[in-house]
Amino acid sequence: MTFQQNEPSAVPAQSSLSFTQGFLLGQLSVVLLIGAFIKFFIFGEAPPPPSRGLSHRASTHRRSNSIYTINPNEGTSRSLREKPSTSNVLRPVPSSATNTRSILRKTYYSAIPTNPSGKHGRHRIHHSSHQPESLDWFNVLIAQTIAQYRQTAYLLKDDPTSSILSSLTAALNNPEKKPSFIDKIAVTDISLGEEFPIFSNCRIIAVDDPNSDGGRLQALLDVDLSDDNLSIAVETSLLLNYPKPCSAILPVALSISIVRFSGTLCISLVPASTPPLHTPSPSPSPPTADGAVNAGIHPTNGSREPTQEAPNAQEESPPKTSPKSNVAFSFLPDYRLDLSVRSLIGSRSRLQDVPKVAQLVEARVHSWFEERVVEPRVQVVGLPDLWPRMGRTGVRTGEDSETGSNAASRSAMSADMGNSLRADDIGREPDGLRFRGLGARPPFDSVSRTSSFNVETGGFRSHSMTREGSGGGMSDDFHMPGTLPGGAAAN
C-alpha cells in the first residue's frame, strides 16, 4: 500500500521538467530566428547595383567577334615580325561597324521592326519597340540657344551691316526675285518671340536606304510652339506700270504672326561617303564651300596664283577638302502651321483684313516652308569640328587665375598663334556660334581669357558681320545673326 501511494507523486515532477525544457528550447529557437533575421535582413549589406562596365558587358551581353579578336596570336606575331607600311597603320573598320543592327545592339536600343509600314514615299520605316524618351534636358539647351540668338540680334540692332533689320530688308528687296510691280519693301516691326519650342516623344526608327548598309537610323521628335508673338510687319506699294511706269500706286501694309506650329522633326546623319541628296527644288542651289573649290575658286597665297577658268582649275588642282559628315533634318508632311495675317490696303479709303490677301500670304508661306524642310526635301547642315584647338579655347569668368608660368607660356603661344592666324585666317568666317559684342574685340590672348568668356568655333572675323557678294538670290543676301551654320545657304 505504501508503494502504490508514492508512485503517482513522481509523474508530475517528470512532466514539469520536460515542459520546462521544451519551453526554453522554443524560446531559444525564436530568439535565434529573430537574431538571424535582424542580422541578415536588416543590418545586412545590400547587393551591389548591376555594373555597366566593360567586365559586366562582356559577361551579360554576347558580342560578335571583331576582326581584331579573331586570332590575337597571329596579329601579335605579324606586328612583331612584319614592319607595317604607311597605308596599313590605321586598322581597317569592319563592315558591320556601320550596320544599323550592329549599332543598336551595341548601344542596347531595342528597335525591332514590329510594324513595317510603307508610308512616306519609297522608304520603309521599322518602328521601334523602345519606349519614347523625354527631352526635358534638350528643351533646356534649345531654350538657352534661342535666348542667346535673340539677345545677339538685339545687341546688333544698330549695326548697319549685321542687324536683322538690314538683313531682312536686303532679302525682301532682292531685285532678281522681287516683281517689278512691287515697290520697295520696308520692315516696320519685328518680334522674335518670348516662348520656346517644346520637344517630346523622341524615338529611333530604322529606315531602308539603298545608299547605306543595313539602312539608316532616324530620330523622330514631336515639336510644338504655341502662344508666342513671333511676327513681322512690312509696308510696300503695288505699282501699276501701264500705260506708263508708276501710273498708279496702292499702299499695302501686312503683318504676319505665327499662332502655332506643331509637327514631327526627323533627324538623321549623312555619312561623308554618301553622295549628296537629290533635291527636286527647281531653284538652283547656292554656292557652297565645296562647290567653290570645285568651280575653281581657291584661296590666294604667296605660292599659288588665282585661277582664271573653272575647267582648267579642276584639271590642274583637284579639290583637297576632306569629306565632311552632315546632319539632315526635315518635317513630316502632317505638320501644322497656323498663321495670323492682318492687312491694310489703300491710302484714304482703306480695306482692313481682306480674306483673299490672307489666303494668298498663307499659301505662299506654306509653299516656301514645304519647298525647303518638308519630306522628301531635307536641310543638310555640316557637323562642326569638335577637335580641341587653342584658337577657340576660353576661360569662364570667375575661375581661378592662371599661374605665372602658365600665363607666360600661354601668352607667348597665343601671340605666335595670333600672328599666324591674322595672316592666314583673317577673312575666314566661323563655322558656328560666336559671342560678339557691339564694338571691336581685342586679340584673343591671356588677358581676354581671364576677363571674359569667349567661345569661338571657327576662324577670326571682324567685329561686324559681313555678307559676301553673290548671285543675288534670297539665300545669298539673307543672313540672320545667330543662325545655325548652313541655315542661310539652305534657303
UniProtKB/Swiss-Prot annotation:
Regions of this protein lying in the Lumenal compartment: 1-22
Q: Which InterPro entries match?
A: Mmm1, MMM1_dom, SMP_LBD
Q: What's in the keyword line of the UniProt record?
A: Endoplasmic reticulum, Lipid transport, Lipid-binding, Membrane, Transmembrane, Transmembrane helix, Transport
Stated name of the protein:
Maintenance of mitochondrial morphology protein 1
* Family listed: Belongs to the MMM1 family.
Describe its assembly: Homodimer. Component of the ER-mitochondria encounter structure (ERMES) or MDM complex, composed of mmm1, mdm10, mdm12 and mdm34. A mmm1 homodimer associates with one molecule of mdm12 on each side in a pairwise head-to-tail manner, and the SMP-LTD domains of mmm1 and mdm12 generate a continuous hydrophobic tunnel for phospholipid trafficking.
What is the recorded membrane topology of this protein?
Answer: Single-pass type I membrane protein
Q: List, in alphabetical order, the GO biological process terms annotated in this UniProt record.
A: mitochondrial genome maintenance; mitochondrion-endoplasmic reticulum membrane tethering; phospholipid transport; protein insertion into mitochondrial outer membrane
The membrane spanning regions, by residue number, are 23-43
Q: Where is the composition biased (Basic and acidic residues)?
A: 422-434
Cytoplasmic face of the membrane? 44-491
Species in which this protein is naturally found: Aspergillus flavus (strain ATCC 200026 / FGSC A1120 / IAM 13836 / NRRL 3357 / JCM 12722 / SRRC 167)
Region Disordered: start-end pairs: 50-95, 275-325, 392-491
Which stretches make up the SMP-LTD domain? 131-384
Q: Where is the composition biased (Polar residues)?
A: 65-78, 85-95, 300-315, 403-412
Q: Which gene encodes it?
A: mmm1
Bias type Pro residues, positions: 275-287
